[in-house]
Amino acid sequence: MRHTFTLTNGVEIPAVGFGTYKAADNTDEAIISEAIRQGYRHLDTAAFYFNEEAVGKAVRESGIPREEFFLTSKVWKDQLGYDSTLQEFENSCKRLGTDYLDLYLIHWPRPSDLNAEWRDLDVETWKALEDLYKSKKVRAIGVSNFLPHHLNNLLERTSITPMVNQLEFHPGYIQKAAVDFCKQMGIQIEAWSPIGRARVLKEPFLMELAEKYQVSVAQICIRFALQCGVLPLPKSSSSERMHQNMDVFGFDIEENDMYQLMTLPQIGWSGEHPDRERVRF
């Protein structure tokens, strides 16, 4: 059975994607090829990941038709603006070896935490994405790491509502205000870092749930995202864990357990925030 989420424009996305950021040093292509062998068809990359060529090569060498894949890329924050975004889109397509993308995102809403012109830059960048979408070069457009005030800037000044917003989301860091806002606007949330960091994997309640449901802690995290209506983008360099991370449709987390997961104290935050310099732990 094929599990998908459906965007507001009717485009379907495989319900679990494969995150490719820092998959492993110098072995991106092998890892992505293995992910494809394990059944992943939704691959998430970005110009900043410096692995679009590896993703494209793995897709081509898989022997699976391009249209069976869902490819996402993103414009980096130092290339915001109308003309530079159009050029960056073409560069990403060239590196990926494709003439279209399934989803293209603005990676971050601000070039830096000190940049005061981000509102106008975001609007110019979004208008470039709108034109790419209207010209059918991309099947869906969206943003990443946008909070409600960043989104409102676009909603008030442009014509197409973002279809996707990628956010850090995992037990212990669910960004409820941003997620609720996106749901109200019909914006699909995708979760980067859906498994969180080491502290999440060692959280006693999550370990207790893993034993209760006879799955891994990572599977609990991924299933939690899905039951919240969030599309997870786990990453792994292990074939076994790749398989486990896809094997999350044979159980449901009970309601009371979901409530406890949603109200965990903050753990595992990456330190990344769109309006602040990164917090180092």
What kind of region is each of these model predictions?
Residues 1-69, 196, 281:
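N-terminal binding-site loop/beta-alpha segment at the start of enzyme catalytic domains
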Residues 8, 56-66, 93-98, 155-158, ...:
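Acidic (Asp/Glu)-rich catalytic clusters
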Residues 23-26, 44-54, 78-83, 112, ...:
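Acidic-and-aromatic substrate-binding clefts and catalytic sites of carbohydrate-active enzymes
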Residues 24-35, 81-96, 149-151, 174:
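Short, acidic/polar
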Residues 42, 100-103, 140, 164:
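Residues at the N-termini of beta-strands
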Residues 66-79, 103-109, 166-169:
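A short, structured active-site edge motif that brings together acidic residues
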Residues 85-106, 131-135:
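CE4/NodB-like, metal-dependent polysaccharide N-deacetylase domain
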Residues 109-281:
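Beta/alpha (TIM)-barrel catalytic core signal, keyed to glycine-rich beta->alpha loops juxtaposed to Asp/Glu
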